[in-house]
Amino acid sequence: MTRFDTIERAVADIAAGKAVVVVDDEDRENEGDLIFAAEKATPELVAFMIRYTSGYICVPLTGEDCDRLGLPPMYATNQDKHGTAYTVSVDAREGITTGISAADRATTMRLLADADAKADDLTRPGHVVPLRAKDGGVLRRPGHTEAAVDLARMAGLRPAGVICEIVSQKDEGHMARTEELRVFADDHDLALISIADMIAWRRKHEKQVVRVAEARIPTAHGAFTAVGYQSIYDDVEHVALVRGDIGDGEDVLVRVHSECLTGDVFGSLRCDCGPQLDAALEMVDQEGRGVVLYMRGHEGRGIGLMHKLQAYQLQDSGRDTVDANLDLGLPADARDYGTGAQILVDLGIRSMRLLTNNPAKRVGLDGYGLTITERVPMPLRANAENLRYLRTKRDRMGHDLVGLDDLDLGETAQ
């Protein structure tokens, strides 16, 4: 098992102007990035980064700083697999030559970190690629972009970092993985940390959602306590329906349900969301204890209601649910489970049995101090309208849906 250094050491090194190595989840990019604070950029640091990485150096910034510096997205609708928010590339307007040397790029990096810098201080395009970090950092998105901004902020510096992926010295056609990164860090006296450890550290020291209200809600599936939350960073409101004693230390049956107006409210047969919500409430009721967490802002797998309706139009023309999103220039799945994980932790849940057919949901909740002891499958709710949709989720999105091949489009299976 790889040995990681403490977050405290990494923060101290960042504050001192050193680089650190940061590893993300093996089910995500499974890569290690060299990271240092942008305001501490020197020709020597940049040259070191260029030597051992892919050389595609980026500078993560807060959304506020991106707006202040006039840094729009590189492309209007982000299609990156992991949602990396690239902006237009830039160079410093003054103090550089061609912009590509280590010294020139260091100048541009320091300028991007300067609180007094203005949009006119930069030229576009250039040789440095700023990235727009999500508000809330690694607690909202467990990526290197957010890790860099968080580390700089935690070190008491301007929230701007410099990142690049470390290349394997054993196989230069691929990226270095965790064990090799440990050796690399030791050889160069660098701290090696994981984003999962950063999340745990921030969760221990910071709070990103607030509990607003709670009330008894009698339903057709029994009485629940509705606990309302609001996200600090985007003001989106979420509701956890709680049944029974969930703080007794035993595994809790949990369903994290994505908002679906068409399925949950209108009873649309194009998806299985409404039946899944009903089934989750019924299963928690039968269990006598558990949580159904209703996540707002997840409409259409995170693309929003209007875009979902547009995707439906494309599906009526023959696209499947994945290609319809992609044809609109949108991700196949844009949902973020970080806020949901924080809510579950606030409710006192540490160990749970997760109600889902979607393995990606488990990955989205891992790293937040939550232990998932079992994935409990949801009942299959297929019909003539959603059978193709369900098969696409199985074949192209990895959902664990059994028995679909025994059905045809003219059948309805409950």
UniProtKB/Swiss-Prot annotation:
Binding-site positions, Mg(2+) 1: E29
Any one of the GO BP annotations: riboflavin biosynthetic process
CDD domains, per database record: GTP_cyclohydro2
Cofactor remark: Binds 2 divalent metal cations per subunit. Magnesium or manganese. Binds 1 zinc ion per subunit.
Essential for DHBP synthase activity, annotated site positions: H127, E165
Active-site feature positions: D333 (proton acceptor), R335 (nucleophile)
Binding of Zn(2+), residues: C260, C271, C273
Amino-acid positions noted as binding D-ribulose 5-phosphate in the UniProt annotation, renumbered to this chain: R28, E29, D33, R141, P142, G143, H144, T145, E165
GO cellular component, one term: cytosol
Alphabetical list of InterPro entries matching this protein: DHBP_synth_RibB-like_a/b_dom, DHBP_synthase_RibB, GTP_cyclohydro_II, RibA, RibA-like_sf, Riboflavin_synth_RibBA
Domain of life (superkingdom): Bacteria
Cofactor(s) for this UniProt protein: Mg(2+); Mn(2+); Zn(2+)
Coiled coil ranges: none
Catalytic activity: D-ribulose 5-phosphate = (2S)-2-hydroxy-3-oxobutyl phosphate + formate + H(+); GTP + 4 H2O = 2,5-diamino-6-hydroxy-4-(5-phosphoribosylamino)-pyrimidine + formate + 2 phosphate + 3 H(+)
Family indicated by similarity: In the N-terminal section; belongs to the DHBP synthase family. In the C-terminal section; belongs to the GTP cyclohydrolase II family.
HAMAP family registered for this protein in UniProt: RibA, RibB, RibBA
The protein's role, per its UniProt record: Catalyzes the conversion of D-ribulose 5-phosphate to formate and 3,4-dihydroxy-2-butanone 4-phosphate. Catalyzes the conversion of GTP to 2,5-diamino-6-ribosylamino-4(3H)-pyrimidinone 5'-phosphate (DARP), formate and pyrophosphate.
Protein name: Riboflavin biosynthesis protein RibBA
Species: Nocardia farcinica (strain IFM 10152)
